[in-house]
Amino acid sequence: MTTIESQCSIDGILLLNKPQGMTSNAALQKAKHLFGAKKAGHTGSLDPLATGMLPLCFGEATKICQYLLNADKSYETIGRLGSKTNTADCTGEVIFCIENYTVSHEEMIATLEKYKGKIKQIPSMFSALKHKGTPLYRLAREGIEIERKARDIVISQLKLEQFDGECFTLTVSCSKGTYIRNLVEDIGDTLKAGAHMTKLHRLYTAGFENNRMYTLDELQDMPLSQRLACLIPIDQAIQHLTPVILSDSEVTAIRQGKVISNKTGAVEGEDLRLYGEQSQFIGIGQALIHGDIKAKRLVSFAL
């Protein structure tokens, strides 16, 4: 079976192992077609060059996409010293080349230390960020450069896995909005050798460290029942939120848009995972003053 014509709602999260050479949106559309999903969205683009985890949200799961967009990510990347490109990766044109450079293992380690923690990063012109509604990469292809402001990012892990004097392999865990190819380029600049990224693989999105990814080929070869079994429950993406169990009457009230009294001890403004008495996921609520809760994003069914 290759595709399905779904007569029912498809709700859940698929952890897709995106192939190289495909845009995130193209991967989303192929997966959406395979599942026959009426509504779908991805949670953080991967460049065509990149592979790895691309969480896709189907149906009611699209209501929690923002939490996955905001989640930390972990990557494995390979950089090459000695040259820079206009895109900071191997798909671009070489704009700088240096033949005579020497970088020791100790120098590389010392340089990586400078990029750990909270740092500033200037996004590449070859990014999906927009200027007056136009993606920067489109402007870059027209030879237009726009001034970009440095942004705060956090590199929580930066580990050197391999280094042969030219190519270096890194494991990087970072906050949202981090451009790994820019990080690789900045490392090369600090070493005064230049560098560009040759490989990028997303290992996981926070919350899914131990979950399996599936390729499009694997999914296409599966029967429908097995394919649907690959979907992850919506609430697994928000396990970092405090869970709150509501009574049947409270579930009814909050679905009607009413504020309910539920002494959770949560901080005002804190998002909460809401469940019914039978542990069915209701959606996301928000804590108010005095422990009250209001609906923030409810699913339209009980899982």
Swiss-Prot record:
The protein's Enzyme Commission number: 5.4.99.25
Keyword Acyltransferase: no
Superkingdom as given in the UniProt entry: Bacteria
GO molecular function, one term: RNA binding
A biological process from GO: tRNA pseudouridine synthesis
Residues of the signal peptide: none
Record's protein name: tRNA pseudouridine synthase B
Organism of derivation: Legionella pneumophila (strain Corby)
Gene name in the database record: truB
